[in-house]
Amino acid sequence: MSDADLFSKLDGACDCKSLLKKHCTKERFDAVKDKKTKFGGTIGDCIKSGCLNLDSGVGIYACDPDAYTVFANVLDEVIKDYHKVDKLDHPEPDMGNFEDPGFGDLDPSGDFIVSTRVRVGRSHDSYGFPPVLSKDQIVKMEGDTKAAFEKFSGELAGKYYPLEGMSREESKQLTADHFLFKDDDRFLRDAGGYNNWPSGRGIFFNNNKTFLVWVNEEDHLRLISMQKGGNLAAVYRRLCQAITTMQNSGLSFAKREGLGYLTFCPSNLGTALRASVHMKVPNLAAKADEFKAICEKYNIQARGIHGEHTESEGGVYDLSNKRRLGLTEYQAVMEMKTGVEEILKREKELEGAKGAKK
């Protein structure tokens, strides 16, 4: 389907509610329809998924880092709308003093927080995103990434498992560990996210299984630090040490002034950081309006532990920072910390009141 045909399909879809539909007007499309990025990408590469899947929420992916400049007339409007900001003035990266971040374990008793996780997305600045990558390029990028993994030592040391040629036993174990990612998302597939699958894809994790990296899943890199309990300081420190090691190894990550770190989907850019806990809040969750109000006040997203649009199980919720854009990495983590502490405080109050009534 040509770029013009894709746009016609979108333009004629009266019931489509995506941000792409809202912001990719005919005037804006016509202004960029003949432009190409330095990686060879077109506006059609960016809008394809949203045109084929009219039930998309966002509907647009960047075909490569340069798309955020070449197709800024559409992408900037989508970004401002999605991230609820008036202007694109994302600050310079700042992870703070991660060796001594000013916080520790959010739940020393271990009675409420089941686990803690912080992840970031990062993109190599010298490679395009999946729609414009050849098989040779994605394999070369995987090689660059593996070379950086070899610099990991101490707690970060581990092993890389490529998806291509993975044994059934390895696949079974990684699935059991919830480490394996799949190629079954139709939005990502139509965006070109699974082109040349499974070449160039893989998973690195450390020996303790508290740090892992997804290579070329959706983004070039998804770095994830996690562990049982509420020790946010340890989780954040490990992640920051890994990012620093990779940058010191010579990797350069794609950024744009005002937007921060660039990702395949514009919904993730900025800090591209998500800090979360799985926490037991059965008493507060039973007071749905109050729970929602606290989450909104502190910019916390609450969802079921199996991801977006899933229900809570046994009063356990996934609580994370809602904002990715317009604040530093350290501020994003602090925002999650503050919100979680308030939720924890209220849960303890409600549990105490319940106990007093008995």
From Swiss-Prot:
Xref: PROSITE patterns: PHOSPHAGEN_KINASE (PS00112), PHOSPHAGEN_KINASE_C (PS51510), PHOSPHAGEN_KINASE_N (PS51509)
Entry EC no(s): 2.7.3.3
Identification of the protein by name: Arginine kinase
Keyword annotations: ATP-binding, Kinase, Nucleotide-binding, Transferase
The keyword Kinase appears for this protein: yes
GO molecular function: arginine kinase activity; ATP binding; creatine kinase activity
Binding positions (substrate): 57-61, 218, 265, 308
Enzyme class: transferase
